[in-house]
Amino acid sequence: MSTPSGSNPLPMADKLEAKGGNGGKIWDDGVHEGVSQIYIQEGSTGGIASIKFDYVKNGQPKAGSTHGNSYQNFTEWFDLNHTCDEHILSVKCYYDEGEIQGLVIKTNIRTSAYMGYNIGTTFTLEVKGKKIVGFHGSFDKNLTSLGAYFAPLSPAK
């Protein structure tokens, strides 16, 4: 398969099933070169009311879609330095009462602070030796489930 001049081919990726609650509207951002930013809006009574992922396309940031109820501004965000090949290795999710309550992002360089609420049981989206290149999940009143696409790590330069 040929690639248009000036564009990078998308990595081969494995889809890790969404975890968390059931039901709600399913969304899928697909596969990208990488993730550049993550934004969340905390729910007024717990959970994550909305989430947005910005991605990397042809080495440049590309705005993603907002998933959920974006009735206010995002309350927390996490920027990745994709120009220095910072990439997400795992996402630790806090889950309670049928909703994702919070996230902790681990990259090859650092780990984020809690985003949202650190209550409930945890699960981790992670595949050893791979990086996250896209997200999918579902929403009802708040974020109910989260899954990810994983691609092989680039060889060290």
From Swiss-Prot:
Its biological purpose: Confers broad resistance to potexviruses. Inhibits virus accumulation at the cellular level.
Cleavable signal peptide: none
Keyword set includes Acetylation: no
Induction: Not induced upon virus infection.
Protein name: Jacalin-related lectin 15
UniProt keyword annotation of Transmembrane helix present: no
Family: Belongs to the jacalin lectin family.
Tissues showing expression: Expressed in stems, leaves and flowers. Not detected in roots.
Domain Jacalin-type lectin: 13-152
Originating gene: JAL15
Matching PANTHER family: GENOME ASSEMBLY, CHROMOSOME: A06, JACALIN-RELATED LECTIN 3
GO function terms (MF aspect): carbohydrate binding
Pfam families assigned: Jacalin
Keywords on record: Lectin
Domain of life assignment: Eukaryota
InterPro entries attached to this UniProt entry: Jacalin-like_lectin_dom, Jacalin-like_lectin_dom_plant, Jacalin-like_lectin_dom_sf
